[in-house]
UniProtKB/Swiss-Prot annotation:
GO molecular function: DNA-binding transcription activator activity, RNA polymerase II-specific; DNA-binding transcription factor activity; DNA-binding transcription factor activity, RNA polymerase II-specific; DNA-binding transcription repressor activity, RNA polymerase II-specific; heme binding; ligand-modulated transcription factor activity; RNA polymerase II cis-regulatory region sequence-specific DNA binding
Family: Belongs to the bZIP family. CNC subfamily.
Assembly with partners or alone: Heterodimer of BACH1 and MAFK.
Spans annotated as Basic motif: 562-578
Pfam families tied to this protein: BTB (PF00651), bZIP_Maf (PF03131)
Protein name, entry field: Transcription regulator protein BACH1
BTB domain residues: 34-100
A GO CC annotation given for this chain: RNA polymerase II transcription regulator complex
Post-translational modification: Ubiquitinated by the SCF(FBXL17) complex or by the by the SCF(FBXO22) complex, leading to its degradation by the proteasome. Under oxidative stress, reactive oxygen species covalently modify cysteine residues on the bZIP domain of BACH1 and release it from chromatin. If the BTB domain of BACH1 remains intact, its beta1-alpha6 degron is recognized by FBXO22, promoting its ubiquitination and degradation.
Disulfide bonds: none
Chain intervals with Polar residues compositional bias: 696-708
Amino acid sequence: MSLSENSVFAYESSVHSTNVLLSLNDQRKKDVLCDVTIFVEGQRFRAHRSVLAACSSYFHSRIVGQADGELNITLPEEVTVKGFEPLIQFAYTAKLILSKENVDEVCKCVEFLSVHNIEESCFQFLKFKFLDSTADQQECPRKKCFSSHCQKTDLKLSLLDQRDLETDEVEEFLENKNVQTPQCKLRRYQGNAKASPPLQDSASQTYESMCLEKDAALALPSLCPKYRKFQKAFGTDRVRTGESSVKDIHASVQPNERSENECLGGVPECRDLQVMLKCDESKLAMEPEETKKDPASQCPTEKSEVTPFPHNSSIDPHGLYSLSLLHTYDQYGDLNFAGMQNTTVLTEKPLSGTDVQEKTFGESQDLPLKSDLGTREDSSVASSDRSSVEREVAEHLAKGFWSDICSTDTPCQMQLSPAVAKDGSEQISQKRSECPWLGIRISESPEPGQRTFTTLSSVNCPFISTLSTEGCSSNLEIGNDDYVSEPQQEPCPYACVISLGDDSETDTEGDSESCSAREQECEVKLPFNAQRIISLSRNDFQSLLKMHKLTPEQLDCIHDIRRRSKNRIAAQRCRKRKLDCIQNLESEIEKLQSEKESLLKERDHILSTLGETKQNLTGLCQKVCKEAALSQEQIQILAKYSAADCPLSFLISEKDKSTPDGELALPSIFSLSDRPPAVLPPCARGNSEPGYARGQESQQMSTATSEQAGPAEQCRQSGGISDFCQQMTDKCTTDE
């Protein structure tokens, strides 16, 4: 197992960027390495050029190309201290702190300075949230219905007009990007030549302009015949979709159709057209006038025999609103119907002023979602070639994408009758798939009155995560003939915004119980944020529990939250330890592999050296045998005391007796050149340490006297040969 030479490993820290920003923020507060001074309304702000240039296109154009010395930048009067101070804090901490007092100023400064990574929809959402509905309702009196401009056509006539609808006109209307809005047409219609800024760019616009825009939407059918034909087509489609769902409603209100017709006739048509006109430009600024355009707020209750629907009801007695839109519109609000049984209509007490204010404030959070869903429903109903298979696939994908959000949204579920369960489930899935256009998360900060907005890579829907704070839960049961209002369940203030860490980690004991724990959190109302429970130390946590009087359910919930967070941290540490062990094992394996490679190289080197030594020894023996003319007796003695591995073992051959000494030695040495060295003969072990020169001299002496010496001298000669063999054996043993 060897690693590739081209393998590259990268370590990525998840806290490096955050720590760098925090360090830069500390330097800014201590005026360390700051190289630019910003003057806003006479107040002085110190900062770093690189940070400002990276966060704002305005500062980038002002800073790039300047000298390296101290730089002073005075911002124009459009930028205020109240709006600039949160922005410079955002540049260094990635947290934008907004309140009701500074949201307008911050919005203007963001637009003027071109600050990056801030969603504009965040400000639009807060504008409606911080809007004081009581003051605005007093400034903008209720308008009466324009029955002359909004004459409702008969249902059968609308069905016939749909067949005559010209497709090219509808496509031209949808593709025309420069079409005039109802707001502009109204001002020309009323003779008002003064132009006002768009709703999405104006932070101080009141409900007065919204009421004017409502009048424009009501008067629009008389101005544009093409659009009137277009909205009739949408109206008939909606009737076909919701006809089976609201059949009983239509039957119960049919005797009073004419008394309600004048006020309720044109509202759905105008509503549809307004949504289609303003959807792409201003999703967040469109729906407030829709809430004002309600039947309960426009028609006098004393003139009709039927009690009008409440403030936030979107049911039209004639069925022009599909039931799916009803579910989308009223899922997060209080939906109270008058009891209807056997076509007997019971009058209901009108809503008081405080109820209207609370419902209007609660609905203002859902308006962007409703507008987007209304547009989606119109487009999906109008396209007749969309098959049911595609809808099922879209529903499946939407459920899979928003499964985490839906698991925390348990108190906001709808309980529908079998007649409308299918439509309701389809619209709920559409609702879940409509949120990704708004990529912000709103988390509760420990300080009261402050919220932190963060742009996320994994999109979280702010409306679903915060509507429970304003009372989002309601249970609606719709029967075939009767409508019974359910009491509103008190939601948990922190139920939908609890974030206990990364849910994508490996399952632990706490994660396996996450579903039941979250349900418990939604049922138990906690007096403080769950994030505070996790972040406190043990002593601070105990003191916090002593400060509050908590019920056993609340204590169980708090301890469960803290236990699950500790389990998650312990699991992370365990995974880190395992990763460290794996890395240590990998390093040890690499060391062993390198040692093995070095040992193999050393072995190859030793084998090559041994081969060279054997070759040298064989050549040496051959040379000695050539120089020493051995007699027949000497050869026999040498062969007798030599081992089989000795280079001189050729003397054992029987051919040696008949062949001369010189002719025998040469070929035998060549043939046995690769054999290992010989072992010491027994008679030569006494002379074990003579040198090479001494052995050679003894051989020469024995060679010179071999012919003249007698049998007594042969022992001496054999001792010289033994010395020679001993020398050769010692050398071979040393080399090995």
